[in-house]
Amino acid sequence: MMIPVRCFTCGTVIGEHWDEFKQRARDGNEDPGEVLDDLGIKRHCCRRMMVSHRDLVDVVAPYQ
């Protein structure tokens, strides 16, 4: 599904950083930890949300 707007644990807004993180870390060759540092995501709970998220909207869409 889509990235949550806020971290489930602390409530910090993380959704606004998803596109840049995906572009730089997943599609590019940058280290995900350094990208998260550059984006200002310091808490381990927020970092977990960004690193472990998988876009499943294309997989689920045919069943709706």
From Swiss-Prot:
PROSITE patterns: RNA_POL_N_8KD
Gene Ontology biological-process annotations: DNA-templated transcription
Entry GO CC: cytoplasm; DNA-directed RNA polymerase complex
Protein name, per record: DNA-directed RNA polymerase subunit Rpo10
Species, as recorded: Haloquadratum walsbyi (strain DSM 16790 / HBSQ001)
Complex formation: Part of the RNA polymerase complex.
HAMAP family, sorted: RNApol_arch_Rpo10
Catalytic activity: RNA(n) + a ribonucleoside 5'-triphosphate = RNA(n+1) + diphosphate
Cellular location(s): Cytoplasm
Gene Ontology MF, one: DNA binding
Keywords: Cytoplasm, DNA-directed RNA polymerase, Metal-binding, Nucleotidyltransferase, Transcription, Transferase, Zinc
Transmembrane segments: none
Family membership noted in the UniProt record: Belongs to the archaeal Rpo10/eukaryotic RPB10 RNA polymerase subunit family.
